[in-house]
């Protein structure tokens, strides 16, 4: 099971005594994207500049893993010093992409934080057996399948021969260039069950079925 949304599914799997080993991975989009960014180079800006609800310049910088001081520094360079907390429209966020992509100072900060987080993240995945040579799949709530893509990129940075598939409650869409054969949805998928999507509230779903602990933000090695 992947991330907090896989919490209840892992419990159900264990209760039904399926003949499969089921582990709970503590991860999130954020905890995987930060160490992934330096592998993506300038393409990481596409992950950082995503639309959403109540997106501000500060939130965009936090997605990149920047500190408060670094956020302010880039805000000054990009002309957002006095509007860091203003809500950005989707079109404004898209216009921000080329600005950040061409800002070497910003990218240097992003890569630095990413490289710092990379080693412990890989160590955690290794600790959980993802490099042991066994076949595995991930189970998650779904929505756009980006966790699977980030997890794949991190794993392939160590061993490109490791492949796995994802099983989801529902998928609205797939990541760019993702192979549909590696993504399996139960309740609705990218090209079907429009009515189910209209009636479904993923916020309620997550509120009811998520794990009791907070979101995983990073990994740290302790006591060797």
Model-predicted segments: where are they?
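Short, small-residue-biased leader/transition segments that mark boundaries at the very start
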Residues: 2-7
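Long, contiguous domain-sized segments
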Residues: 40-44, 55-62, 69-224
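Long, charge-dense
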Residues: 17-64
